[in-house]
């Protein structure tokens, strides 16, 4: 049991946070957040952070660790998460990693590839091409060169599009090849519990309801407060979080309210689609349909079975 790490993964709005809090009442877990949006301070409503009440019941590590103008990489996440896992196990508890940033899960479990350093000449060339042809053109180029990576990132995620093309131009190999190649893996046994709603319509409806709830709770005002406190720009990594970019465009007068709402919901559904694409190919994952009554009971039973078998062995 000393090296056992549980991972609760799933698409946005699938019920991960509520389940994680419930699991803490049954097992000696400590929660590590695996969410590239929740790392940011002052971004609470739009990232669907656990409530104050939930955090009091179930503290989460790696929430509110960066300002919205800062960046945070998969490599930094791996360093932080592995350090926390060691501390949690030393205390006699079990790490429970919870979130939907699949690239973080992938990097942690499979190890980070030794990717080439950034090359200013290649980046400048790509930026010039983006200015003349547009980022949509570069995304289409990436889709042809590396369809696996293109399917995992958003068409407007210019930073990751640039990095994926940069890796290809520097090495002749795709980023997806690096991510799936043999790497040094951490010395843990990961149990992957995947929430995978079979009916997309159910998930899509939950996403729409949650986005509307965020707007009612003050999502627009949250973005205005960010603008007042920080030098917020639309190309910041934090502003790639779904909803924030659309509200920035709305506040700039580029969208009306209804268009902003529709685009925010659509972007969230696209995020869920990419997360499900990752999960569908996740080897060894245990899948649970979170729209089924009693799915949580099944997960609790499985965890108990795994822990009992680990102790007996």
From Swiss-Prot:
Substrate binds at residues 12-17. Residues 35-38, 159-163, 240-245 are annotated as: Interaction with substrate tRNA. It catalyses: adenosine(37) in tRNA + dimethylallyl diphosphate = N(6)-dimethylallyladenosine(37) in tRNA + diphosphate. The keyword DNA repair does not apply. It comes from the Bacteria. It is an enzyme of class 2 (transferase). InterPro entries: Dimethylallyltransferase, IPT, P-loop_NTPase. The record marks 101, 123 as: Interaction with substrate tRNA. Its cofactor is Mg(2+). Keywords: ATP-binding, Magnesium, Nucleotide-binding, Transferase, tRNA processing. Coiled coil: none annotated. NCBIfam families: miaA (TIGR00174). Monomer. Belongs to the IPP transferase family. This is tRNA dimethylallyltransferase. It comes from Legionella pneumophila (strain Paris).
